[in-house]
């Protein structure tokens, strides 16, 4: 009897693991994504993409930390497009890189993507997309609202990780 229970338990856990792995999870409908597409997959272009992403994350953190709704976030992003372009330009200049770039905000296509073991469906999503150069390289993406991947960037350039669930609970339930 004990062996049967163990066997059934193992089958149950395998079933759950299989279902979780193969289910699609979606980012909430009311979300704003952020994407940086590299010029190419060369080491140099991927490094440039990373530096642009990091510079913009600092700006986003400062601007969006006061946002409580998707409308707040949308307005902040729309009103700061020139600031994002300036940040990209300054970052490229610091790297001594002369490269075209495009900044667009609106509905943009995202391919199916796996992030931290969760598969997100492809589709058109409201997003801020930065395309560097030819935009033929690997991309970075995350979600600006709700702040699923926002990192708190401190002034000394250290990155501190926060607990998303706690932050969301504090912000939306406790109104901190």
Per-segment meaning from a language model:
Residues 39, 55-67, 83-95, 151, ...:
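Structured segments of extracytoplasmic/periplasmic soluble domains
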Residues 72-111:
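Amphipathic, coiled-coil-like alpha-helical scaffolding segments used for oligomerization/assembly
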Residues 114-115:
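N-terminal post-signal-peptidase region of extra-cytosolic proteins
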Residues 2-19:
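Hydrophobic membrane-insertion alpha-helices, especially the h-region
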Residues 19-29:
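Aromatic-capped interface at the extracytoplasmic side
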Residues 118-172:
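Soluble extracytoplasmic domains of inner/organellar membrane proteins
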Residues 37-41, 106-108, 133-135, 145-148:
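Solvent-exposed coil/turn segments that connect beta secondary-structure elements
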Residues 30-78:
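Early exported N-terminus immediately downstream of N-terminal targeting peptides
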